[in-house]
Amino acid sequence: MELLNLKKQGIDIKEQIPLSRYTFTKTGGEAEYLAFPKTTDEVEKLVKVTQENKIPLTIIGNASNLIIRDGGIDGLVIILTELKNIEVNGNEVTADAGATIVDTAFTAANHGLSGMEFAAGIPGSIGGGVFMNAGAYGGEMQEAVKSVNVLTRAGEYKTYSNQEMDFSYRHSIIQENGDIVLSATFSLKPGNKLQILDHMDYLNALRRYKQPLEYPSCGSVFKRPKGHFVGPMIIKAGLQGKQIGGAQDSTKHAGFIVNKGGATATDYLDLIHLIQKVIKEKYDIDLHTEVRIIGKEN
């Protein structure tokens, strides 16, 4: 198989690997093939082989806001975490798709650049953060992104401006066109380094206080419906602390689903569907997932 030829060329490709090793929920079935490219050239070669041989292709970043079903994923899964270079040029920071949002935000801060403080505790990768326009504490990626470099499924390199990314709440054009984020450049403002770092430390302390970081979790599961907050609705509906299998709606922060031990992706999804059903019945509000759900049923 062509993929195995690339393996002989030195690209890190594995077979039948449990994706639960990589997801923040510690759940998920196997990847038929799993690759960890170290350069954009390796990404291009992998994409080309999948297109020429009609092999299904799935791109994953830090797997922090992701649920992979227990049946796993056919074809090739590419995890981009080996692409992690971060460069500072004046008031701009350029980070590879696999660089963590946290590392990028702190690199900016340590250079006295302001504009990514909100991202100090977001556990995802730059690629995933751009893909879903990640945000926290009143800030979103769209406010800092200047441009995004991508590789299309057809193997073409492109650069999108902020406007071309079509950002909105937890959305970007990448979700629609399937392009692969390779890097993003952030346009920031000079600031007081110590004040920036102090603010980031404060936000991280707030996060530790409010969020159930002691358990595996995919973070905030649901998008916020207009005019409502998910947590209070879940509490009033009597669902906080509800558990199915090893998956529990957190007693510390309603709307976060944690793995209390031995949870499967099916446990997670059953609990998500239960919460959606009860909230619809009680409030006539459709809760949509912020977390990305992929893979096959078991």
Swiss-Prot record:
Cofactor: FAD
Record has Flavoprotein as a keyword: yes
GO molecular function, one term: UDP-N-acetylmuramate dehydrogenase activity
Gene Ontology CC: cytosol
Reactions catalysed according to its record: UDP-N-acetyl-alpha-D-muramate + NADP(+) = UDP-N-acetyl-3-O-(1-carboxyvinyl)-alpha-D-glucosamine + NADPH + H(+)
UniProt EC number: 1.3.1.98
UniProt function note: Cell wall formation.
Name the UniProt record assigns to this protein: UDP-N-acetylenolpyruvoylglucosamine reductase
Annotated organism of origin: Lactobacillus acidophilus (strain ATCC 700396 / NCK56 / N2 / NCFM)
